[in-house]
Curated annotation (Swiss-Prot):
GO BP annotations, alphabetical order: ATP generation from poly-ADP-D-ribose; carbohydrate metabolic process; DNA damage response; nucleotide-sugar metabolic process; regulation of DNA repair; response to gamma radiation
Phenotype caused by lack of the gene: RNAi-mediated knockdown results in increased sensitivity to gamma irradiation.
Signal peptide residues on this chain, from the entry's feature table: none
Mutagenesis / variant outcome for changing residue 594 to A: Reduced poly(ADP-ribose) glycohydrolase activity in vitro
Distribution of this protein across tissues and organs: Expressed in head and tail neurons. Also detected in the central nerve cord and motor neurons.
Known function: Poly(ADP-ribose) synthesized after DNA damage is only present transiently and is rapidly degraded by poly(ADP-ribose) glycohydrolase. Poly(ADP-ribose) metabolism may be required for maintenance of the normal function of neuronal cells.
The organism's taxonomic lineage, starting at the top: Eukaryota, Metazoa, Ecdysozoa, Nematoda, Chromadorea
Name recorded for this polypeptide: Poly(ADP-ribose) glycohydrolase 1
Region (Disordered): 28-87, 102-131, 206-232
Similarity-based family: Belongs to the poly(ADP-ribose) glycohydrolase family.
Effect on the protein upon substituting residue 555 to N: No poly(ADP-ribose) glycohydrolase activity in vitro
Top-rank taxon: Eukaryota
């Protein structure tokens, strides 16, 4: 049967002709040994009414053109092909010696990026983030629109995930590909020359790397010199404090720059955080020197540290699966051979050999093969097609095809750089630490994961919604960076939990404490910060709707830092007394808008602060923690939601959840802030005053300062500040405040400031304040 294209229009484009030639004689007609599934056609695609004009190619990467020429020459002359193959083998071995974990062995290095071809209109930091704040103010409707979709997708995904790990099925998640070091025909002399030049530049500019990155960001984004000067002061302060805290303070006091806006405001905060980390000799958990290696697994190599040797584990036949399925390996965790292994290996190798000449539909064909779609039907991928057309006009067709190939190359590294076993955070397994490159390999495999996996990118690629095109921009920017200039370091994923009795003991010891220090920031956003704990307003399923249509706070964080998606592979659905900590995630992109108006943006200085290499700890992790805590979803009218939230069991549950997350780093972080905002108050319909008070109590239990970002609601923030000041004047303790919100009573009609009004009533009566000192127990939930 001849292959037919679904809703691709007529007449046939050159790309389609190339693909027809490819599938007629090439790898696409090879049938895998396993039984193929026949899927129905996607119903959400739109028909193309006319043949889209193929964008003209641009000379974006000179080395790409030379590679094409060398491929054509080698195809005509077998002797040249043999010589190229031998040269590629030698080059591959040389690159492996210089950097064993390098992901870009077969990727050209170039200073050109996608952002060089974006609009030259300046994007100032304050303008971008002011836009984010303005949109976020009225984002509740956007949240609600995507919430219903996400909840259904999460429920379906949870059931699918249970099915995937069933004992009577083969573990399904990632197709298996093995790296082939014998035929790397897409390496050219120009790529070798470029790589050598880059190595020389890295050696000569090692002492000025971060300053150079700031200059590059300034040129690309049009950021004002004042903002860059402020970030330069932060960098200078960081380097100085590593030598001496006293010399750091003197340097800062004599280095006044005309910084403006949030850059200047946050500069002082960051200086205090640097001092706290340095003088306190603080290490974010897990401290790999002190934790039990049999529960805290380190899968990457860290200089000057011995190899990690955790105990070998086997899947429990009747419990949750602990070994992460790795379909890129020839054998599964039980030693059984995977029949699909060599089939997928041939597909990926075949694509990388001829992707430059066969076009867009070659990549579509690869995805169809990996997903095991019906070989006689090509299902349309609207989001991918729209991305291809849009980006071809901006950077050229050849560069977009190179972006696709980079994903495939990174996916090929999985078998080489990942261990044979990666354990999920279930049972007594507490944490997993992987390198940035290992994380990239896992995320790249999600591109090729079968559609029935809850961790597949298929739902993004096959959507016809514009938000999914923006998500692809985030993802391909991530893979571009990891291919051409990957950061060196590690990321830790940790499940933090506490049983009910232990928490009750903690509460008894801490309920007599005074309220914590609370600072308010009207313009600063959570993602503007560094050297702190950033709160992720999470779904109980980590990542929420990031792999679907979700585009609110948690999804945006995961798009800015795609390696956070590895946590989705490692973590089960969060339980009531659990939180998930991610330490060291690198930021790859910025954004504008919120919800359905979300847009990708090149990385801005305010978001790149936490990427500073000087902020890395001795394990190579960036000193920033993202703590994921999920709130309760309330439904109904505003009055119904407010009444339900004032139920004592719900107050106790939310207080425990926030406290466990805020206590994740232990007792030594008393000067390191928790940066948060209106947690659970968007699509989850949380009462903002109540959620603010609950987080104040949780920060007090953790004995850490609270930095509260009001997201453009200064009036509400002013009321929060006023109520905190009044309570401090009355010497209100954590236990007294907890008692107040547990005895507010129920409102007769919805009033936004009902909780504050009731607290003010208590504060007006000293008798009520004294009587509330006998705080209730929190053990009822």
């Amino acid at each position: 049967m001849s292959k037919k294209f679904i809703e691709l229009g007529d007449p046939v484009t050159q790309d389609e002709k190339d693909y027809e030639d490819y599938v007629g004689v090439g790898f696409a007609h090879q049938v895998p040994t396993m039984k193929r599934r026949k899927l129905t056609e996607h119903g959400n695609t739109t028909e193309s009414k006319e043949d889209p004009e193929e964008p003209k190619s641009r000379d974006v990467f000179v080395s790409s053109q030379s590679s094409d020429e060398s491929q054509e020459d080698s195809a005509e002359n077998p002797e040249i092909a043999k010589e190229v193959s031998e040269n590629c083998e030698n080059l591959t071995e040389t690159l492996k010696i210089s950097n064993i974990e390098s992901l870009d062995n077969v990727t050209e290095r170039s200073e050109h990026t996608l952002d060089n071809h974006k609009s030259t209109e300046p994007m100032e930091e304050d303008v971008n983030n002011k836009s984010n704040i303005d949109v976020a103010i009225n984002s509740d409707e956007d949240d609600e629109l995507v919430l219903e979709e996400n909840n259904k997708e999460m429920r379906d995904g949870e059931q699918v995930q249970q099915d995937l790990f069933a004992d009577d099925q083969e573990l399904i998640e990632y197709p298996g590909i093995m790296k082939d070091t014998t035929t790397q025909l897409d390496i050219t002399d120009s790529e070798v020359e470029t790589a050598q030049k880059m190595e020389m530049i890295e050696e000569t500019e090692a002492d000025s790397t971060f300053v150079g990155e700031d200059s590059k960001n300034q040129r690309q984004s049009g950021t004002t010199s004042d903002e860059v000067d402020a970030d330069s002061q932060i960098n200078l302060a960081t380097k100085t404090v590593r030598t001496s805290s006293s010399s750091f303070l003197s340097t800062v006091s004599t280095c006044e720059a005309p910084a403006k806006g949030r850059a200047r405001m946050y500069q002082k905060e960051l200086e205090k955080h640097v001092i706290a980390f340095t003088e306190g000799n603080l290490t974010l958990q897990p401290d790999l020197n002190k934790v039990d290696p049999d529960r805290n697994y380190r899968y990457c190599t860290i200089p000057n540290f011995p190899a990690s040797q955790g105990k070998l584990r086997e899947d429990n036949r009747y419990g949750p699966k602990i070994v992460l399925p790795q379909r890129w390996r020839e054998f599964d965790s039980r030693g059984r051979r995977r029949d699909s292994y060599f089939y997928f290996k041939r597909k990926l190798d075949g694509y990388l050999k001829c992707y430059k000449t066969t076009g867009y539909f070659m990549f579509v064909g690869l995805l169809h093969n990996m997903w095991e779609f019906d070989p006689d039907i090509t299902y349309k991928l609207p989001a991918l097609e729209m991305y291809y057309k849009e980006m071809s006009e901006l950077v050229g067709r050849e560069e977009v095809l190179e972006k696709f190939a980079r994903v495939a190359r990174i996916a090929k590294t999985a078998e080489d750089i990942l261990p044979e076993r990666i354990y999920r955070l279930v049972g007594d397994v507490e944490s997993a630490t992987l390198s940035h490159k290992q994380c990239a390999a896992l995320v790249a495999r999600m591109f090729f994961a079968r559609p029935d996996s809850p961790f597949s990118f298929c739902r993004i690629l096959s959507s016809d919604k514009s938000i999914c095109v923006e998500k692809l921009k985030f993802l391909f920017t991530y893979f571009d960076k990891m291919s051409m200039d990957p950061p060196d370091g590690a990321v830790s994923f940790r499940l933090t939990k506490m049983d009910k009795d232990t928490f009750n003991e903690e509460w008894k010891d801490k309920k007599l404490r005074s309220l914590p220090e609370v600072e308010f920031f009207d313009e600063m956003l959570i993602e503007d910060t560094a050297l702190c704990t950033q709160v992720d307003f999470a779904n109980e399923h980590l990542g929420g709707g990031v792999l679907n249509h979700g585009s609110v706070q948690e999804e945006i964080r995961f798009l800015m830092c795609p390696e956070m998606m590895v946590g989705m592979l490692l973590c089960e659905k969060m339980k009531q007394l659990e939180a998930i900590s991610i330490v060291g995630a690198y930021v790859f992109s910025s954004y504008t808008g919120y919800g359905h108006t979300l847009k990708w943006a090149e990385l801005q200085p305010n978001h790149s602060r936490q990427n500073t290499n000087e902020f890395r700890d001795r394990f190579g992790r960036l000193r920033v923690e993202t703590i994921a805590i999920d709130a309760i979803l309330f439904k109904g009218s505003k009055l119904d939601c407010q009444t339900e939230q004032l139920n004592k069991a719900n107050i106790i549950r939310e207080m425990k959840k926030a406290s466990i997350g805020f206590m994740s780093q232990g007792p030594k972080f008393t000067n390191i802030p928790i940066v948060t905002g209106w947690w659970g108050c968007g699509a989850f319909n949380g009462d903002k005053p109540l959620k603010f008070i609950i987080q104040v109590i949780a920060a007090g239990v953790a004995d850490r300062p609270l930095h509260f970002c009001s997201f453009g609601e200064p009036e509400l923030a002013a009321k929060c500040k006023k109520i905190i000041e009044r309570m401090k004047q009355k010497d209100v303790t954590l236990g007294m405040l907890f008692s107040m919100i547990n005895n507010t009573g129920l409102p007769h009609k919805h009033f936004e400031f009902y909780v504050f009004d009731r607290i003010s009533t208590y504060l007006s009566s000293s008798e009520d304040v004294e009587s509330s000192k006998s705080s209730p127990s929190v053990s009822r939930a």
